[in-house]
Amino acid sequence: MSRFPAVAGRAPRRQEEGERSRDLQEERLSAVCIADREEKGCTSQEGGTTPTFPIQKQRKKIIQAVRDNSFLIVTGNTGSGKTTQLPKYLYEAGFSQHGMIGVTQPRKVAAISVAQRVAEEMKCTLGSKVGYQVRFDDCSSKETAIKYMTDGCLLKHILGDPNLTKFSVIILDEAHERTLTTDILFGLLKKLFQEKSPNRKEHLKVVVMSATMELAKLSAFFGNCPIFDIPGRLYPVREKFCNLIGPRDRENTAYIQAIVKVTMDIHLNEMAGDILVFLTGQFEIEKSCELLFQMAESVDYDYDVQDTTLDGLLILPCYGSMTTDQQRRIFLPPPPGIRKCVISTNISATSLTIDGIRYVVDGGFVKQLNHNPRLGLDILEVVPISKSEALQRSGRAGRTSSGKCFRIYSKDFWNQCMPDHVIPEIKRTSLTSVVLTLKCLAIHDVIRFPYLDPPNERLILEALKQLYQCDAIDRSGHVTRLGLSMVEFPLPPHLTCAVIKAASLDCEDLLLPIAAMLSVENVFIRPVDPEYQKEAEQRHRELAAKAGGFNDFATLAVIFEQCKSSGAPASWCQKHWIHWRCLFSAFRVEAQLRELIRKLKQQSDFPKETFEGPKHEVLRRCLCAGYFKNVARRSVGRTFCTMDGRGSPVHIHPSSALHEQETKLEWIIFHEVLVTTKVYARIVCPIRYEWVRDLLPKLHEFNAHDLSSVARREVREDARRRWTNKENVKQLKDGISKDVLKKMQRRNDDKSISDARARFLERKQQRTQDHSDTRKETG
């Protein structure tokens, strides 16, 4: 398991007790943290301790601005107190008398940690006056006046209460991150005020908070609403371009050694102050922690370190799949004489504020979900950050004193590879789930919905196509009864479709654990240390073997069931190199899904089907009902070809139980693809062609114009003709005419496959013979 957090240096060797347990070390750090807060804090009206923030000088003005305007934009540097103090001010000014003050955050971690902080400052129990709601965790009550939540939770609120009658103020925080859900909330709130519904509260206020964003554009979107600027108190930050990455290295992320070296140089040559390092994900972070620890252990603090007050380096990782308790450690001050180094994902750039940071190391990259039009799927890719994100990162070094930011990349990389602003998620990811939500809110014309930045029409049509394939909408683009049921599930539509199919066959027990496991982060721990790596791989192979060794979906079900039935699930996870936090989340997801299925099956018109066959076949047939878009057929060697009309080549991921068994397979379905040196299918199981034969035509038989529900009278005839022609051309390019489909069906019987393979081997043998004859003649 990971050894971090850990202290490298001579400080731990000074302790008479030897190595203390991690729990005792945390207890001491917690005591230091509490004492430090009590010493530096000031008493608020609620009697808690609140540090000073720039927003405090603007308190009266900002409260009045909220009173005077339906929409208000609040901007200020990270650390100005927007997130924690403004909701308190509005509560103390009486806004909560008419409903809750709802504050959205793009990340679950931020929603929970900020709610804990505000509850502490207001001296109340978390879940009473101050609460939070995130996916699968509602820590609020009837008493709750300030509710922090993810933007997705607010969207769910709107589904049940389109007029937001339970709220007096909605605060959309971290708007500059431009998440897909936040952008949809922009449009829904604008429509709510435009339509002047008789059920809408007249006193509902909307506040949009942003650290860096195109503020004039946002103001114009909300009817030229005022912008309230909170003057910052950032100290000067010196920036240094280290020139270790240039424009030609845009796709090269093998920069960990360089980042560790820069971090170590800071520790040796700079005066006291904590370090914040930005990397893209868990693997990079854990590897960097390991390398940094090895280097820091060899330091002679009597001769190598410029600041003689330093005795060691406390190394702390920070990424999304860590437990809440693990993430809390980064906020605690280090022991005397110890420099803290937090190695984090982008979560520490805006959502979390860590005191004491004086040095920032900016790796220049971030993991980002992008839609791949060639594959028709969302792909998690490592891409350069934007200039606005880079400024956010450097600003972390100037919150409490002057600081320094070390940028790994060059100035040319800054100018040529980094966009000015974050590309909104709505312009680069799948819109399937949000389009279904809009349809369920009776917003049928999703193309002309009021978007701050309208997405590419192709993405909207792709979403409509996928919803039609799942039977969530009909041929006219109207939501079906199934679609209304699907929107209640916290799952992607295709996975929801598979779960509902299983419920109709009365075998949901087979699918629910798998759906729960697929809805949490990757459960497998893959350590960096080679020795531990071999042990982890062996344990994972054993788990796959218990599932039959030929179905990654079934492996997830085995992990779920075995962990849940063990007497000590956390210990079981540790032994098998599985993330206990992810399993714990999966247990909660499964319970929620089971309750949703129970209510669904109580409906009088819920369809019931029967199927006689072994369990493993029923499971795979149910998966086909939702995943038929992700069907692939083996083509040449170990390569598979997708059947969605694009014919994209994919390879089975090395982590799959089916890796190196490709020659035994003909047809597969997969959960997702990863793009590295190749396009990999991840979480795979074999299927039979006859299971998807009747489903594959649905990938091609649809009319984009009908599905979009565009008001036909408002579309000029020539525009409709161009649209129809474009669709016809696309179908011709993709080769998806009915004749082709019929040919495909004829090609896919066992005899045709066998004959085709024989012809391929014959041609290959002939080419080899010709090549050999040519060489002989040349010789």
Curated annotation (Swiss-Prot):
Entry annotated with the keyword Hydrolase: yes
Record GO terms (molecular function): 3'-5' RNA helicase activity; ATP binding; ATP hydrolysis activity; RNA binding
Coiled-coil features, chain-numbered ranges: none
Region annotation Disordered: where it falls in the sequence: 1-28, 737-779
UniProt entry keywords in alphabetical sequence: ATP-binding, Helicase, Hydrolase, Nucleotide-binding
Annotated Helicase ATP-binding domain residues: 63-231
DEAH box, short sequence motif: residues: 173-176
Residues noted as binding ATP in the record, renumbered to the chain: 76-83
InterPro entries: DEAD-box_helicase_OB_fold, DEAD/DEAH_box_helicase_dom, DNA/RNA_helicase_DEAH_CS, HA2_WH, Helicase-assoc_dom, Helicase_ATP-bd, Helicase_C-like, P-loop_NTPase
Disulfide bonds: none
Gene3D superfamilies, A to Z: 1.20.120.1080, P-loop containing nucleotide triphosphate hydrolases
E.C. numbers: 3.6.4.13
Range of residues in the leader sequence: none
Catalytic activity annotation: ATP + H2O = ADP + phosphate + H(+)
CC per GO annotation: spliceosomal complex
Residue stretches of biased makeup (Basic and acidic residues): 13-28
Tissue expression pattern: Ubiquitously expressed.
This protein's record includes keyword Transmembrane: no
Function: Probable ATP-dependent RNA helicase.
Family label: Belongs to the DEAD box helicase family. DEAH subfamily.
Protein name (database record): Probable ATP-dependent RNA helicase DHX40
Organism of this sequence: Homo sapiens
Name of the gene this protein is made from: DHX40
